[in-house]
Amino acid sequence: MTVSENSVLETEVLVGGSAMPNERPGAMEPQSLSQMPEGFPRRSTVANGVRSKVSRRFFVVGGALALSAFAIYEMGAVFSIGGITPLEYLMLALFAINFCWIALAFCSGIAGFFMLLKKPKPNELEQTELHTRTAILMPTYNESPDRVFSAVSVMAEALSQTGHGHAFDWFILSDTTDPEIALLEEQAFLVLRQETHKHSRVYYRRRRKNVARKAGNVADFCRRWGSRYDHLLVLDADSLMESSTITGLAQRMQADPDAGLIQTIPSLINGTTLMARLQQFAARIYGPVIGTGLGWWVQKEGNFWGHNAIIRTEAFMGAAGLPNLKGKPPFGGHILSHDFVEAALIRRAGWSVVIAYDLPGSYEECPPSIVDLAVRDRRWCQGNLQHSRILPTKGLHWVSRLHLMTGIMAYLSSPFWLLLILTGLMLALQAHFIRPEYFTDQFSLFPTWPIMDSDRALRLFYITMGVLFGPKIFGVLLLLKDGNFARSVGGRIKAILSVIFEVILSALIAPIMMFIHCGAVMSILMGRDSGWSPQRRDDGSMPWLTLIYRHRWHMLAGVMLGYAAILDSLTLLAWMSPALIGLWLAVPISAWTGSIKIGEFFKRIGILATPEERNPAPICIRAQEARAAYQAHIEQPWTLAQVLKDPALMELHLAMVDKQPLRAAGTPIEPVEAIVHVKVHEAQCQQSALALFNRQEMALVLANPLMLRSLQKLPEQFVPEDLVSFC
């Protein structure tokens, strides 16, 4: 069958035409990290189109450095009265690292606080006609198809009603490796096409091999279809976006010829467990303060968070091709946390990267439990620590390097905090058990007294707590000032109760997460790869025995730290109790925060409520309704046996199989592919062949038309020759 004949067949088989449009190949070469590519950075189209204001940098970064210098000086003064010991020098160094980390967030929070006090500017581009084309990409990996396809359905329908639907195409880019989910995706795609083909162009592709994970998935699309589009709007499997946000991003990109990437700040929604609702509330009340402040001072050197952002295709394909790092994982191989790196490379090429902190209507979901958060953070931790290999990249803007460093510190801060706690504990135990050395080896008429300035230490403690909790305080002040905002979360009293509850529960969870991150860092330094596991999205509950196993070291660490503290005094134990209680109760805290029932209880009494929960956007309501409908549509999933048995079903399936050419003759064959070939060749019937396949092999067969045709030619069941002769 010729290519043209194949296209006609697909058009007849699938409602709305072929599963994917015709390819328009384009180059997306891996970028050099050791030298600046020729022609970079590009000359901006608009004068000062990619230039940022130095004054904003001076206020935030300079303010953070000045605040850190003051705190470090004060800490040194606390120790310096009687001379600084080696252990005190260590504590001073650890304090400096940790304080610099929180000082930057605090100063960003100040900027965000004052920006949010202003009235938002009207959208001057709202009526702008779109003459550019945007591909909206929804990558998915072993996710629930009802969630993914229903979200695309409602977003596509809403966008079609704006009058701008002609400027957008929708793509579900699957990297699914589970054969059952892959067949469910095909069923869901047929339903989606049936619903949307009259008003939207929606496509589906499942890769045979998920090389380089999500980054490789998007790069594969770019190399084969990217040249058809001016922009790429990248979503995640749990993303939702209002139509005004989608068109707003495209209008901003169209209006700014120097914009390479525009990132929204997503709001968290659909949390059902206590842990998810805790994250939702914190992100909604405190998140805008940090996000707005960050967007204000980074300006044209913003960041990319992997989804809910629009990217100029020319900038992405021309500047953000990711190289493989030398060596093996976890520090070598494919770049895992690709988003920060892609933003840095786009900015290096002379395009601006902007955080659209003033654009609402962007949504995502969050992990439902501490364990699920730990699984996700293990992967992110490896990707962020891998950025230590990216930091020396030639030509990166210093703000881009700071973004990379911030990502690294998001996980290294936990070991540094733990070391700070242990050092302080050692100083207390040293003072309690070890006789001071009043006269050192150097001759002196006066003794060296191991004393500290307790008043200054207490004052510094209050300053540190103020810096640490500053962004939370700013968020609460904004909430209390805005009556509409306060009413949207249940009123000021409920809001204050929610804040108090969030602070207490977060304080209990923080030491658990500290040890989880410490364990992740240690396992990465020991050379262990994270793998790629699909995320749980809804229920976070687990058996208690599983939780005991997961948190056994956290509880043991809490007992050991408590024992060490009580060796000194009950006062020290009391000071450490906020951290220790969380560790001692790690298992019940993990169980309760991952419970949907407990989450629903707090929802009923109005604690940790958000505006999006109490008054959800129409797109969120429709997505929930559509998801239930999709669940009903695909409640009876196809099987490979049914596909082989039913010729019409086979044609439908083949119409949705990726048309990328199979392995060329003479090229190396992968072991799993060779095994499948042998099993298909030796099988006497379809039933025996299917019984031999494992899940990986079955997924490979589903993506290989030649193997499917070979299996289809086999009899459904084996009939012995003597029985045939007898009949």
UniProtKB/Swiss-Prot annotation:
Signal peptide: none annotated. It is an enzyme of class 2 (transferase). Disulfide bonds: none annotated. It is a multi-pass membrane protein. One of its GO terms (biological process) is glucan biosynthetic process. The chain crosses the membrane at residues 58-78, 94-114, 278-298, 408-428, 460-480, 496-516, 572-592. Gene3D superfamilies: Spore Coat Polysaccharide Biosynthesis Protein SpsA, Chain A. SUPFAM superfamilies: Nucleotide-diphospho-sugar transferases. It is found in: Cell inner membrane. Pathway: Glycan metabolism; osmoregulated periplasmic glucan (OPG) biosynthesis. Its EC number is 2.4.1.-. Belongs to the glycosyltransferase 2 family. OpgH subfamily. Involved in the biosynthesis of osmoregulated periplasmic glucans (OPGs). This is Glucans biosynthesis glucosyltransferase H. It comes from Shewanella sp. (strain ANA-3).
